[in-house]
Amino acid sequence: KTYYRAIYDHNRDFFIHGYVRTGMGVSKVSRSGRGPRLINMEMQFRKCCNHPYMLEGVEQLEEAENAKANASPDIADHPLVSSSGKMVLLLKLLTKLRDEGHRVLIFSQFTAMLDLLQRFLRLANFTFTRIDGSIRGNTREDAIQSFNDESKGIFCFLLSTRAGGVGITLTSADTVIIFDSDWNPQVAAR
């Protein structure tokens, strides 16, 4: 919430009046592109909604704050989890799903978010495999076969939405989590 608010506050004049602050006062945003770009602001809001660590500098700030406090051994208190409401909920949900014997697919739009989810799954001792757009050929097939082979005991499969739905059969999964749906309804409908 704090970081979302900071993005808004940084661009408040633009949102309210179509103006931006300059060193010499306030000037109207011109068509030439002065002022914040809406697409960039949207992307910053999307990142913030996924996890504050996706914003530049936030992870270092949160980790420094945590180092000052007495670090708890409880995973729910780890800054990677506690700084994101989605991660707090995901920890509770995945713990319950694992205890009940479910197998889970987790989709994300961003490979950087998959990186954070991968760190989270390791921290929580959840077994997983992953594919994204950078994983090709045999490595991709091996990850799919490993997940589908129940004897391997892989609980989660991380997938990027772009790499994930094409030519993949993951019949052993019974739960799908879309960590961050696309803000474009046409893309999300696919």
What are these regions (language model features)?
Residues K1, A6-R12, V20-C156, S160-G164:
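Conserved Helicase C-terminal RecA-like lobe
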Residues F126, S134-G137, T161-R190:
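Conserved RecA-like helicase motor core of SF1/SF2 enzymes
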